[in-house]
Amino acid sequence: MRVWRVTRRAHAAPDGEGARLYGGRWNLLNTPVVYASASLSLAVLEYLVHVDRDLAPSDLVSIAATIPVSLLVETIETGLLPKGWQAPSDQESLQRLGSEWVRAQTSAVLRVPSALIPVEFNYLLNPAHSDFRRIIWADPVPFSLDPRFLQ
């Protein structure tokens, strides 16, 4: 299975450091996790919702990763999430879910619904899990946002 990331070149390393420093929808502060998406287009959308249109970086890269089919992928089903889980203001329950998954070390990959497009999926990758090393990362490729995204 192939997953994608879009990020600034300086943050291309799949170490979960950005998520550890700032937290995210699915992780609390001090919990390293690598965020990826099921498609490059979803990765772009997930990136765009966090960028200031006036400060869009020019050093973006896309990075593909291949998750071996033999690797366990756990899933959080949309129907099991609390009401309002997509709201940007109420992420604590999701952060606890994701952080507990990281701590439990039950798998290196967790499939979660996208808050932007709930029928599509993002993937949390646990860099502390022993199977994380089996994920194969392609080299970062320069990526430019179409200027229409920033209008």
Locations of regions flagged by a protein language model:
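NAD-dependent ADP-ribosyltransferases
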Residues: 5-7, 14-27, 34
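Small-side-chain structural scaffolding
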Residues: 18, 36-37, 43, 98, ...
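Short, solvent-exposed amphipathic alpha-helical segments in soluble enzyme
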Residues: 21-23, 48-53, 126-128
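Short, well-structured hydrophobic secondary-structure segments
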Residues: 28-76
